[in-house]
């Protein structure tokens, strides 16, 4: 297919500035890169932070955000092997890494000190054509819907890796704090598919309904419960074996240590601005509780997360909007009005 010189994309020139839906140049792939015709992109809370500039990590400017892009390979650099024109490919948060440092050698590529990040340090998937390092680009099976698979590329991989990091077994209880947003709605399904019992913590009747529809076992509305810790203890017959914190509430993170059982694990995923993780040292030591951070996933985690999706074990509850509507999506994110995951169609 003929590749145009210009395309539609959303770009901003300063943090918090206007999100401009406009014609921008189509990027040229470097020798190690793919050029992907992005059909759909999920919208992640990280994209909001990149625009606001409120993380202690510098972005490039101007910037095209987005890091859950699903599309088709239309060109590639001369050093690329193992890919063909027409393959389905995904743009992840980790666009590229050095592949030679200690972290990369240990398959901890997201922790590479030279990591290149889609929609942050590398123009991302809120455009019709985007580049991705051929080594890190996700291989999407041909039998899947590109709109539905888009959120798996970050949200799905992230929660799947977080659940693996909890080191629990089938039949154990996992509590998901922030259960029905874009991350939580996928965490519920991955947890069920991995054989765990799922308790969800969130707010609102709409989210309670979604939690049950996705197969969750017990839902706590934190705005209605009189004693959340006591309710978790009662529901799980002795508190949770693990907690996955995907909320962006500092208070929720600190509270989660209180409803984790002895030798359990608290996994931190959500990144609230300027937050601290506070834990009573005596309680943590005597109960031998582990508090760990989990940051996206490596290539194997991506492959495994996509396999769960392609087998129909997880499905992102998505709403599709046009790329031109991205500013309104950010506004709803700020107000906490997103249920499930928003996916933008780059053709609209």
Curated annotation (Swiss-Prot):
The protein's required cofactors: Zn(2+)
Gene: ADH1
E.C. designation(s): 1.1.1.1
Protein's name according to its UniProt entry: Alcohol dehydrogenase 1
Organism: Kluyveromyces marxianus
Cellular component terms per the entry's GO annotation: cytoplasm
Cofactor-binding details, from the entry: Binds 2 Zn(2+) ions per subunit.
Gene3D superfamilies cross-referenced by the UniProt entry: Medium-chain alcohol dehydrogenases, catalytic domain, NAD(P)-binding Rossmann-like Domain
Subunit structure as annotated in this protein's UniProt entry: Homotetramer.
Binding site for Zn(2+) 1: 44, 67, 154
Reaction(s) catalysed by this chain's protein: a primary alcohol + NAD(+) = an aldehyde + NADH + H(+); a secondary alcohol + NAD(+) = a ketone + NADH + H(+)
